[in-house]
Amino acid sequence: MQSAFQRDCLEILAEKAARGQTSRRRLAQLAGMLVVGGSLGLRATGAAAETKDLVFVNWGGDAVKAYDAAYGQPFAKETGIAVKEDGSGPTEGAITAQFKSGKPSWDLVDADPFSAMSLGKLGMIEPIDYTVVDKAKMRPGFGWDYAASTYFFSYVIAYDSKKYGAMAPTGMADFFDVKKFPGKRSMYKWGAGMWEAALLADGVAPDKLYPLDVKRANDKIKGFKEHIVSFWGGGAASQSVLTGGDASMALIWSTRASLVEQDTNGQIKFIWDQGLISPGAMAVIKGNPGGKAAAMKFIASAQDPKRQLVMFDMLGQGPANPATDALIPADKKHMNCVDPANMAKQVALDMPWYAENYGAALDDYIKVISA
């Protein structure tokens, strides 16, 4: 689930750079940081292996640069422990293979919290040491046994304001109401957030969503399929289905919603009302070669508000530490999915439920949308 979102963040960053929308000073800083110390290499071998280091695995591309600038270089300067970025992608299968090898080369991973929970229960992920990592620097409810939240994104309703004029949707019921809001729709291919959207539209109260009634949600979506023009798998597709006029309304990632609103000069707008907040997290592989203590110190250092501001600036990720909110410029607060004003309108995905049920629920969902 998270891998698709993270890869899309990289696409957005590349697009911003191509358009000159990313700070030249920031890119210069990144380039300088990458030259010094060659931090993008893998863990050293031989005599060089005696040097303390950590390997942090994310989804590659410009995420390597962003994570290195925001977290890796400051941590190395503070502690003398080098952080080497690996962009090969920490899928559940890859993490499992690392653990089962008996000699993992990875230390930390950018993980779906629910994946970390599942693998943690199998003994593959270290419990988060909350004597080192500070729960007070997290938003309430987003610190789990095997994963520490580091960022957020949301699934939100984006719509063509030219088609609807002054009338704007106010929640998921409007998304599913083609009489009030005529036109085609687009939804996410991999299920997350879509069950919640369907249930909210079907009258379930936000605080009564979990445990999700997957059958009810899938039935709602099945009965609505004639109005769905596409089930998108990547952010670029979710954006183009709106800008190309194929759909007049779509459930898309908040990062893409902000971008398409800017690109269309406000023709495509989005709302936070009944948005669905999804967290990202860091986790530590059991038996990591750099040591649990160093890995926990790294996670704690990543809680610094100024460092999380870099990730918001570069990748559009909502910060995990609420203290970062005050550092975001006023003209960008509307793009922060966890700004208090925006967060109050939304519902958070329940990670423990996903840890127990996502696999089976996704199988059923794929059958519905593929039929």
Q: What do the predicted segments below correspond to?
A:
Residues M1-R26:
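N-terminal secretory signal peptides
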Residues R19-R26, V35-E50:
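N-terminal twin-arginine translocation
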Residues E50-P113, M117:
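Early extracytoplasmic/lumenal segment of secretory-pathway proteins
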Residues G61-D68, P104-V241:
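Extracytoplasmic ligand-binding site segments that recognize negatively charged/polar headgroups
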Residues A116-G120, T243, S248-G266:
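A ligand-binding cleft/hinge motif common to bilobed small-molecule-binding domains
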Residues F153, V214-F224, T264-K286:
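Periplasmic-binding protein-like
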Residues V156-K163, L199-V204, P279-K292, I299, ...:
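A bilobed periplasmic-binding-protein/Venus flytrap-type ligand-binding module shared by bacterial periplasmic
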Residues I285-Q346:
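Mature extracytoplasmic/periplasmic domains
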